[in-house]
Amino acid sequence: MDKHSLQQQVSQLKRKNIENEDLSDVRKEDIKKPMSAELGIKSIFYDPDWNPSGKAPFGLKNIPYNPRTFRRDTPIEPRLNGLKEIPLPKPNIKDQDQKSS
C-alpha cells in the first residue's frame, strides 16, 4: 500500500470522527434546549387548564414573554395616536331586523 494513500485514509477517518463528534454534540444540545413551540409557563399561550405546555397554535410563533414587561390580565389602554374621538359605525339595519325576527 502506498504511504501517501494510507495517510490520506487516516486523515479522512479523523475528519469523519470529528464531524460525527460535532454532530453528536449538536444533537445533545438540541435535546437539552426546550422546543420553541412549547415554552411551558413562559409562553404567551400558556394556560394551566387548556394549554399547560404553552404550545403555539397552528400558524403562530411562540416566543417567551419578558416577565418584567408582560403582565397577565391587566387592562389595556388603547393608543389612538392623538385622535380624541373616533365615531362608532352606525348599526346595520339588516342586522337589527334579523335579530328581532
Swiss-Prot record:
GO cellular component: cytoplasm
UniProt keyword terms in alphabetical order: Cytoplasm
Disordered: region residues: 1-21, 70-101
Major subcellular location class: cytoplasm
Organism, as annotated: Kluyveromyces lactis (strain ATCC 8585 / CBS 2359 / DSM 70799 / NBRC 1267 / NRRL Y-1140 / WM37) (Yeast)
Record bears the keyword Transmembrane: no
Gene name of this polypeptide: AIM4
Listed name of the protein: Altered inheritance of mitochondria protein 4
Biased composition (Basic and acidic residues): 92-101
Highest classification ranks of the organism: Eukaryota, Fungi, Dikarya, Ascomycota, Saccharomycotina
